[in-house]
């Protein structure tokens, strides 16, 4: 039975790049800890074992992890990586229900150089079509187009380039319409934005200079008569 005004607190981080120990003691309390990818610095299973130990020390009752483009082990040695990650639920184009919330996680981002979990041109729709319609919290490593995806243009000074995925944006706005989309990947665009019924959160822990200085994003999921609503928590 749905409980009106039920509140579930999500603590969201991303892009720690192997520097997770440097944010120890800085994570607020919450019901679910979400890591939106790029856990690792060099992408090895050995690093993942260390991250797993760190996750086990965090007090949150539930933990969800997706991979990012730096997390090579999840693509090159997926069985070893999944075996090493025992302290969190790993989502890769898959979902889970926790505390009445439906989550879906996906590591893919548009092709950029020779990283991991890269979508080749033309593959985007097939990837995002997998997301079910009833997802409350969508966790993607990268942002949708023009939402917290701004980077400096490498060829023209003072110009901003939007590098998010337009097909992901279309899937979110036309089909899924989640209460919350958590992502990272674009360190420069850390922050949050509300657009229609969806709260978008870029939870990149590392700055553009790869310093783990950005605070965790804390979101309260509140159950209403019309379903779940996401709002930034007041700490």
Annotate each language-model stretch with its function.
Residues 8-17, 100-109, 136-141, 199-205:
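Active-site-proximal beta-strand elements of phosphoester/diester hydrolases
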């Amino acid at each position: 039975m749905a409980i009106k005004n039920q509140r579930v607190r999500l603590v969201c981080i991303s892009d720690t790049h192997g520097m997770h120990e440097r944010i120890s003691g800085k994570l607020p309390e919450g019901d679910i800890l979400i890591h939106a990818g790029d856990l690792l610095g060099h992408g090895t299973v050995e690093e993942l074992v260390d991250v797993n130990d760190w996750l086990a020390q965090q007090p949150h009752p539930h933990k969800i992890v997706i991979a990012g483009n730096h997390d090579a082990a999840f693509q090159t040695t997926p069985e070893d990586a999944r075996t090493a990650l025992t302290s969190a639920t790993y989502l890769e184009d898959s979902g889970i229900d926790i505390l009445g919330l439906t989550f879906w996680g996906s590591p893919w981002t548009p092709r950029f150089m020779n990283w991991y979990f890269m979508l080749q041109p033309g593959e985007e729709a097939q990837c995002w079509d997998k997301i079910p319609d009833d997802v409350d919290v969508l966790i993607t490593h990268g942002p949708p187009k023009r939402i917290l995806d701004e980077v400096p243009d490498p060829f023209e000074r003072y110009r901003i380039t939007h590098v998010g995925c337009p097909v992901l944006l279309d899937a979110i706005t036309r089909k899924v319409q989640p209460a919350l989309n958590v992502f990272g990947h674009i360190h420069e665009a850390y922050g949050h934005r509300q657009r229609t019924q969806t709260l978008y959160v870029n939870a990149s822990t590392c700055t553009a200079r790869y310093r783990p200085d950005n605070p965790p994003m804390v979101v309260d999921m509140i159950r209403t008569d019309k379903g779940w609503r996401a709002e930034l928590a007041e700490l």
